[in-house]
Amino acid sequence: MKSIMMAVALIATASTIKAQTNSDRISVGVGALYERGLDMTISYEHETKYHNAWEYFANGYIKWDECQSCGHVCPDSFWRNYRSYGFGIAYKPCVSRGRNHHGNLRIGASGGSDTKNFLGGAHFGYEHNYTLPRGWKLYWQVKSDIMIKGEDLFRTGVVLGVKLPVK
């Protein structure tokens, strides 16, 4: 019995431990942005050492306005006012760690279009992740986007989302 316990201890100390290093996730996030904006992001995230990550994302944005005829937000003034989309990349260095949670800065760039012009974007923000069983993560994100040639120069807001493991 003593030799079996010694063998188990030797195997346990000799093997390498990887705690979510080099893991990949698909994430979906939805949020509200100032002023009168909704944002949806679908992304693929590759996590490297120490919870640093690279994110490749597709983003859609809608800005609604009040209807000219009725003075309320109606389907036409919501869906057909201003829309844009973009594709980009973001680097997310980890700045805080704890048990089952970590926080990352989010620094990135994107390119896309509204219904008329090409848009370029610079993205800055903070993202906090909470790890759930089976590799799932919940996250909230404070984002600030600078959009070049867009209707909004600055977009800022909060996004809530979920990340699902790929492997």
List PLM regions with ranges:
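A generic structural signal for short, solvent-exposed coil/turn residues
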Residues: 11, 20, 34, 46-48, ...
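Short glycine/proline- and aromatic-enriched beta-strand/turn motifs that initiate or cap beta-hairpins
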Residues: 19-64, 157, 163-167
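A generic structural micro-environment signature
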Residues: 7, 34-36, 138, 150
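Outer-membrane beta-barrel translocator/channel fold
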Residues: 55-122, 129-130, 135-165
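Cleavable N-terminal export/targeting peptides
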Residues: 1-23, 166-167
